[in-house]
Amino acid sequence: MDDNDDWFTICDEKNIMLEKNNNNEYKISFNINLKGGEDTVINVLKNGQLFELLSALNPDVIDKITVTEHDGVHSVFMTLKNSDQADGEEVDKIINVYFSLKYNFKENKCIITSKKNENENNDEYHSDIKKKYGKDFLHVSKIKIKVVEKNNKTSVCITFKTDIQKSNNIKNMFIGLYFKKIFYRFKQYFE
């Protein structure tokens, strides 16, 4: 993603910023003031507990996360839901997303980037996913999660692109807002 893209703010509440550009790329950025101890963002990432923690912190938003690892690449299948029941529906706005990630650690820094599967644009690949999980998954690409810890402060910047046709801007926005909500609770967990 190009830092020179024109980003506009969707939401900047609770010290966590959600921005979007015209290419359906989203950026979530926030700082965490660590309360001390061994439970740091970097340690959670190193121990492979990120998605387990996100799921535990967001039972009303994340219905299910399945993570498989092969050759250092983590394939993540996530079902997002809205079950606040404010509109009288028991569960609605279910969105299934998937992405593949590669982790890179250096001292007090972790950079997670999306790793494209050669078969992702292949109809047979999508058919195999649907057969395996019983549902269609929307691909989220160009993911970059940069985490830097310094002096009891952690800076997190997450960028990603939704691979949904422009005509479905509402679904794009839901994914951006769901991810913001998920990572807001992640931020709260460490503070």
Please report, for each region that a protein language model flagged, where it lies by residue.
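Eukaryotic helix-grip
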Residues: 2-191
